[in-house]
């Protein structure tokens, strides 16, 4: 979402639609958490869309249909972190991922031509209430009766509706892990085989309800003006959306998008660490892991500007920035009382002033790194450090950026608390 909103006035955003089948909360609006992390206005519509692998494409379609009556653009974000049993086929083909697009009127990078939905209660897999893992049906039946019958019907209906020939499609995005399914669909519909988009199976895996948006964003990265992009989402039916890239695609700006984030990835070749991170092993975590991590909800709400939005303060008298915000200005030459106005720190450039690695305190990924982060323009924060490559030595003075991450898991009550952590600023950022 932050990458998508680069260069966008966040006060103009009128809504955020979140899509996932692995939301962290069942009865707390997850889109509201993301809205806070993005420091969006409270005068927006927030919506969670779930319960299907086409939740991402459905969220995008819903936003496109409702944006004309909205008071501004709508951010559509899809994310997924599904659990898979160890050594299962799903573990081999799926991955965690997210993507976001901004939908609105004006001068878009891609013009929406039209969309179509076929709702079919075709159960290729399911995850029942209280279950941690998906139950999957036989793959050949899913391919022959699902992908090869339901999807072509939806795609042909859309092409007939908008008056576009299958031969005019330049990029066909179909989110499926099975090899040759997308190319088989293309042949059946009449789309050129070279127009079939890479499903990114070798780079990130199939990212569930987010994968339609992941493929769409990846296609937009490579699109040229006038090219038509057909994207589908499959799950208890099929969503199909058709876009045409505009001249604005050439000036999209400096964003990481899908390629940049994949380039920032760090391979993990130790399988037991993967199992541990995904709670697929019963681990001895030691007595230091037995701390009660209950979150006081009243305290969380009182401090949510600081904890979820990373808002500090700026003195309206002398201009000094500080974190956290306080009643009295920290500038010894000022000391003004009640002069602080909100100052967002999440996107500020920062440097690492000092750091340490603690091997005594509990961490699921030891050691625990933390250090003093100095923000450009003023303000300091003693912060947890994350995504530290043990093969690359930290250095005082390196550039840092802030990322929104889980701070604590309260396993006794099923609550997770978020906060901001610092991570090294890679060149690709």
Predicted regions span which residues?
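Cys/His-rich short segments
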Residues: 289-349
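Conserved hydrophobic positions within beta-strands
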Residues: 350-352, 385
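Active-site pocket-shaping loop/turn-to-helix segments
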Residues: 1, 47-54, 90-92, 132-153, ...
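Conserved catalytic cysteine-centered active-site region
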Residues: 21-73, 183-215
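OB-fold/S1-family single-stranded nucleic acid-binding modules
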Residues: 403-429
